[in-house]
Amino acid sequence: MSKAFKLTSKFKPSGDQPQAIEKLVAGLEDGLAYQTLLGVTGSGKTFTIANAIEKVQRPTLILEPNKTLAAQFYAEMREFFPENAVEYFVSYYDYYQPEAYVPSSDTYIEKDASINDHIEQMRLSATKAITERHDTIIIATVSAIYGLGDPDSYLKMLLHLTRGDQIDQRKILQRLAELQYTRNDLELRRATYRVNGDIIDIYPADSEREAVRVELFDDEVENLSYFDPLTGEMLRRVPRITVYPKTHYVTPREKLLSTLDQIKIELKERLSQLEKANKLVERQRLEQRTKFDMEMILELGYCSGIENYSRYLSGRNEGEPPPTLIDYLPKDALLIIDESHVTIPQLGGMYRGDRARKETLVEYGFRLPSALDNRPLRFDEFEKLAPQTIFISATPGPYEEKQSDQVVELLVRPTGLIDPEIEVRPVATQVDDLLSEIKKRAAQNERVLVTTLTKRMAEDLTEYFTEHNVRVRYLHSDIDTVERVEIIRDLRLGVFDVLVGINLLREGLDIPEVSLVAILDADKEGFLRSERSLIQTMGRAARNVHGKAILYADRITDSMKRAMEEAERRRIAQSAYNEKHHITPKSIQKAVTEIIEGARTYTERGRFVNQAQLIAEEESKYIAMTPKQLAKELRKLEEQMYHHARNLEFEEAAAVRDKIQHIRKGLLEVKE
């Protein structure tokens, strides 16, 4: 059921925000295809966009350059729109090794992937929301331009049930099998169902914590209700329900059969070509692999790598763009590209890398030529499909500057914070000078970001600072997304004072505690020291009232000059605003919260809690007990362990067993 977008916030637009909202909304209503929101760090770009969405009342897709920023934006939008559908659509792979062939060493690398079940559920929830509700905001990464199942086929496969319907139980079970749900009478999990007499319990693939109960009386649907799959408690009765498929790649049976006919025709043509070219090994390989896939599709309705036949499954012609998340959007949707100076080049680069890999697979008989149409969108195709667009960036790139019909500036921060003061200091003494600056900041409980040009320099610097009793960490490209978020969180909490990095301390890092940004070798002109990179890096200190940026350089390059001039322009605009409205700058106060749900565990009561905190709390509880109480607690835990084992819940039983061993080893020794 759709509602109107309703923004919930204790803040009202202030500073440059009211005029920016007004201009963006007017631009959308006037039909401008592209607009740019040029917003300085800490000016409230997210809040401005949220207000614009509320005013235009249009479903919105927001593209982010990486999962970290997508999670940050998702958390903020959920706070702003608690009553609306705010969804998250990113790649569901924790690990992904694409199928590839290396001719030089005759090495075939099979596709290998580990899918994150929770993110898969969120992706399915996103497409469900956008098809059912107008009040939907989806936060996505470039995953949104990769091929997804055809929306028409997907929507044809929905299972609709209404109270009073005449339908045979076998027919419902057959439809669930077509939706790729599996029967599991022991444990009800996502995308499974169980049958108990005339009652069918279904756990929808897109649902996080609600299952569906279908009660039949003979061949009539007598009752439909939602229940908690963990406790079995009934939540509410409903007059009708819709069950969505387990995957975006489900296809009606008749379409599968016509797909097999088309694959046969293409296979015959391709085998003939390979035979004429005397590529007999490739011919045999292709025939064997394709026939195996066809057999699987005929029997099960899918096969491993079914996406390679997506041209036929979605009924497209050769070379036509694949269906993507953008095809699921309604006609009046709005597209917002955050950190556009990074996201736009990403969108442009996806197609080429994918194409090169697949051409090798086709040439050596691992795939049919139609597999080349299982691909991300080309940039020109993305442009044609994209609805009205707003770019967001503190440093818009050349594409945005060229395309935008209007640039809306957001230079004034409501907090009164002025762009960091910039100083240029000589390179010769940069390390020792920086060390003395760090000690000053650490004494005031403030944090420091240091950016270097090379990995070696970052490592050496970290080692040097550690020797001088500085609490320092080094952020490098080998650190995964969740760990990176944890390091930034520790920096904010004061676990350490200095974070050293290369190109990782840029877009969207929201760390109000940072009062100093040091850029080493700032005069080495190049990508890492371009005007945009310098503005973005210096902006990390713009959320603190004592913000300062030190550029270590022996000369002022053109990039430095332009970056410093832009910072000065922004400082003048902010100072004039502060003077006019009698504002005293204040540092941004922001609670340190978890933004990535993967770093948390879901408890039975529906709350997310930090895993480490959970263990620490448990331990402190047992330490406080007397030996008698501890023995009683151990007996209780043993009963719990046997109960899980009797119910075949072996994972839960193992977890309780480990807890018992931990108490016996650690805590009982301490007590003795």
UniProtKB/Swiss-Prot annotation:
Presence of the UniProt keyword Cell cycle in the record: no
Keyword Methyltransferase: no
HAMAP family according to UniProt: UvrB
Domain UVR: 631-666
Motif (Beta-hairpin): 92-115
An example Gene Ontology biological process: nucleotide-excision repair
Species in which this protein is naturally found: Coxiella burnetii (strain Dugway 5J108-111)
GO cellular component terms listed in the entry, alphabetical order: cytoplasm; excinuclease repair complex
Domain topic, free-text comment: The beta-hairpin motif is involved in DNA binding.
Record's function text: The UvrABC repair system catalyzes the recognition and processing of DNA lesions. A damage recognition complex composed of 2 UvrA and 2 UvrB subunits scans DNA for abnormalities. Upon binding of the UvrA(2)B(2) complex to a putative damaged site, the DNA wraps around one UvrB monomer. DNA wrap is dependent on ATP binding by UvrB and probably causes local melting of the DNA helix, facilitating insertion of UvrB beta-hairpin between the DNA strands. Then UvrB probes one DNA strand for the presence of a lesion.
Protein name: UvrABC system protein B
Domain Helicase ATP-binding per the UniProt entry, residue ranges: 26-181
Main location as per UniProt: cytoplasm
Helicase C-terminal domain ranges (all copies): 430-592
